[in-house]
Amino acid sequence: MSNLISINNPINTKSQIQHELEALEIYNLKEIQEQKELVRSFWLDLVKPSEVMMSCFDDAFEEVMFGAVIWALNQDPNFPKVVTISRVPHKINNQNIPGSRWGIDNPDSVYRVIPIGESQSYVIRGKLGKQLFNENHFTLWDENMKTIGLISGNDIKVDSKNNFEIFVNPKSNERGKNHIQTSSGAKEFYIRDTMIDWLNDRPNMLEIEIIEASRSGKGFDKKKRLRTVKAYMQKWAANTTRWNQQALSKPVNEFSFKIDRDTD
């Protein structure tokens, strides 16, 4: 736990910095830029935006595409990382890092993701902040972002210094421990810290360890990583359009929406 306690900014970790710099390098590859233009054409043809919509498309599109790269590069369940997604533009060593805001960008929340395999075992270690957040969930998703496991930050057992461990594995019971059971289709953790007081609060400190004996393969090679990035760029455009379809299909200023996670 000692390395967790020393972190002043739980988002700006060494792992996060390395991940974002790698994402920027891959994002600028000719192959990925060509894919971006294909997705751009696909998206515009699918939505057919108005002039007003088009006026704010370009900047938002860049963030969605870079956000897809950030997320796609953390998909290997045998070599998981804690990665913060949906960030505003910022700098690393005077290098501009694009924003990665996508989906429902809530400025009061910090979102992090961890890839998980259904048969592997992990330990999520962390340290809770000084006060509980309005919302702090460790949600285990399947491929379609449907919840198959959950533990609330309010229910996590901690030590005297607010440190904790969450055991993630296929076992049905871990008595006396923070535990989430994996099941068929388990894909990743989606972790949300909703801040109350930005002057005094800090996101929870987090790190992930895979139990070595459960590791089932080598890391993704470059070809697979690039294929995954391309797939996510396409997926992010398609999903954003799907989620916005109720607004796109209604007259201007019509807000009678129905939210149904099974069909939206």
Question: What name fits each language-model region?
Answer:
Residues 2-264:
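A compositional/structural signature for long, glycine/proline-rich flexible linkers
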